[in-house]
Amino acid sequence: SDPAQAQLTWQIIVGTLGPFVRVIVSVLGSVLVGHSPHLNIDVHDDKSTFHRFDKFNLKYNPCGQSRLREIFLKQDNLIQGRFLGELTKQVFSDLAASKYQMAEYRVSIYGRKQSEWDQLASWIVNNDLYSENVVWLIQIPRLYNIYKEMGIVTSFQNMLDNIFLPLFEVTVDPDSHPHLHIFLKQVVGLDLVDDESKPERRPTKHMPTPAEWTNIFNPAFSYYVYYCYANLYTLNKLRESKGMAAIKFRPHAGEAGDIDHLAATFLTCHNIAHGINLRKSPVLQYLYYLAQIGLAMSPLSNNSLFLDYHRNPFPMFFSRGLNVSLSTDDPLQIHLTKEPLVEEYSIAASVWKLSSCDLCEIARNSVLQSGFSHVLKSHWIGQRYYKRGPEGNDIHKTNVPHIRVEFRHMIWKEEMQQVYLGEANIPEEVDK
């Protein structure tokens, strides 16, 4: 759009909203005299916005326009993301005050142009967005069809190049993208996101290569997964050769849609978000158990969008020994308090009657699944946390009894030996 028109739009919106916000705060101030710490402009979605993921997504763009989101929740706008930067610092401050909560925040790279990485990294560095309580994941929305229709990209390969070429360039020569080099030290994972319930064509061996994919149709979930994994695998080998940390593949999967999504992520990912559709496939569920692939589950989010809380498979997965943890998803819309993670744990404990031992084990799983450094994990759950079985459990830090860890490890080893006919090569360490 025309910059002058965009600037005018910005001035109109600010001019319209400014007095409105000031009036509300003024009225609240007159009611809550002497209680100014309680004043805020928190919002929460009405329940009618849930039930359908496509309708839920539309609420990010009121009246079909993304202007409000661009102003307040984007880093590449006319004010260079200053508002979002200040908001993020406040969240960092709250996490530091809580002391015992760490977060893995997600920011988006869309693949529309290669300069997105530098814009995002500059926003992080220029706003000094660093916290010992936070690491970052990059989420890639699966929106090729939209970009193709708009004429932004010419092929799927064009989108992949926009996502991965800057990463290869900065790995080979950090001086080529100095801000990105700094930012990537805080990036621990790559995520794929979008509505999994959308109908899609099943992938076949006759599908075109990314360079040949020039039609307007969106590739299947597994197509995205394979090519993102292939590029990330090569990138990580290069980063490891340079002494840099690997970036793990940790997509959203199994929240809805085809069960094949979970088969694709089983072959490629480090861990996944959600995975509730594993309840429909005992075979895949067993494979995820044997591989101990982490499932970061969000029952309250699922309850609002896809699956009633009492039907959530989390307690079944946990009792069977799958590597599950509790996490938050869309806390601004889903949760009702300033402690969304506490909400997840407290409601799960209450509804499913989880013991204190259960909660401690789930919290330990959460640390193991996370992308935080070896030093921090050693500080939180013990120096030998990466060892399997009781040897890797420091009861003084995890509060998980040795007998619980030993039982889990013994059953898992027996299952592995059963599958491999007594010749299983049991790894002694978990993936750090």
Which residues does each PLM region occupy?
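Metal-cofactor-binding active-site regions of metalloenzymes
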Residues: S1-K432
